């Protein structure tokens, strides 16, 4: 009878260890997934800042340069005027 109780206690201890290991693994997985989700959100926010801030600036710069080049192409040349 005593031996059966000892085996039962060992079995409960092993099952407890397995449950503990599984719980730790699940906790680690949850923490890693939360970290990766946070990292992904930061990357998306940086992309949004790029879209809202940098891209319009580049567009305005390029359009301004195009207008400047167009103006220089269409303006009439300076006429040579004799000194009066």
From Swiss-Prot:
Residues 1-18 are virion surface. It is a single-pass type III membrane protein. Residues 40-80 are intravirion. GO terms for biological process: disruption of cellular anatomical structure in another organism; viral budding from Golgi membrane. Keywords: Apoptosis, Host Golgi apparatus, Host membrane, Membrane, Transmembrane, Transmembrane helix. The keyword Transmembrane helix applies. The chain crosses the membrane at residues 19-39. It is found in: Host Golgi apparatus membrane. The keyword Repeat does not apply. One of its GO terms (cellular component) is host cell Golgi membrane. It holds the Pfam family CoV_E. Its main location: host cell. Belongs to the betacoronaviruses E protein family. Plays a central role in virus morphogenesis and assembly. Acts as a viroporin and self-assembles in host membranes forming pentameric protein-lipid pores that allow ion transport. Also plays a role in the induction of apoptosis. Homopentamer. Interacts with membrane protein M in the budding compartment of the host cell, which is located between endoplasmic reticulum and the Golgi complex. Interacts with Nucleoprotein. HAMAP family: BETA_CORONA_E. This is Envelope small membrane protein. The lineage of its organism: Viruses, Riboviria, Orthornavirae, Pisuviricota, Pisoniviricetes. The gene is E.
């Amino acid at each position: 009878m005593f031996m059966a109780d000892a085996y039962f206690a060992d079995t409960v201890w092993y099952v407890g260890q397995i449950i503990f290991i599984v719980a730790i693994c699940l906790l680690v997985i949850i923490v890693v997934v939360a970290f990766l989700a946070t990292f992904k959100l930061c990357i998306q926010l940086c992309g949004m800042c790029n879209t809202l801030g940098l891209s319009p600036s580049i567009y305005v710069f390029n359009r301004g340069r195009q207008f400047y080049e167009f103006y220089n192409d269409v303006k009439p040349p300076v006429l040579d005027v004799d000194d009066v």
